[in-house]
């Protein structure tokens, strides 16, 4: 992905990519012109270009070096789809999520019937504990400080 200024043309970006990758890139897609979260080069708008390519590591290193030199390319991001976890992952669609409640109701009787739960009886310890509620109060003591008047030189 390449981030360029709002006035930079698509042909400029494609010619730069052709000079580095020598027609190895599959496609260079211009994404929409967007407003940035913060200013880059005193502007709040930029263009994104998404580039898919297959090339060697030395060409990627050369691209990074030249994009740092070129003033028209503001930012760049290189992602290796083969080694990056989760980017080429094929998701399983046959997996069931959730429950089928119709099957569960048929096991408990007629459809739509539910059993009432019996109230749980409290043990003796639980019932005694709930009866005994002690109030907690924090004792506060006040200290009185008596200060002595300072002696002056005249009194000595």
From Swiss-Prot:
Gene3D superfamilies: 3.30.70.60. Residues 137-147 have a biased composition (Low complexity). It holds the Pfam family Ribosomal_S6. Residues 98-156 are annotated as: Disordered. GO terms for biological process: translation. This is Small ribosomal subunit protein bS6. CDD domains: bS6 (cd00473). GO terms for molecular function: rRNA binding; structural constituent of ribosome. InterPro entries: Ribosomal_bS6, Ribosomal_bS6_sf, Ribosomal_S6_plastid/chlpt, Transl_elong_EF1B/ribsomal_bS6. SUPFAM superfamilies: Ribosomal protein S6. It comes from Mycoplasmopsis synoviae (strain 53) (Mycoplasma synoviae). Keywords: Ribonucleoprotein, Ribosomal protein, RNA-binding, rRNA-binding. Binds together with bS18 to 16S ribosomal RNA. Residues 113-135 have a biased composition (Basic and acidic residues). GO terms for cellular component: ribonucleoprotein complex; ribosome. The gene is rpsF. Belongs to the bacterial ribosomal protein bS6 family.
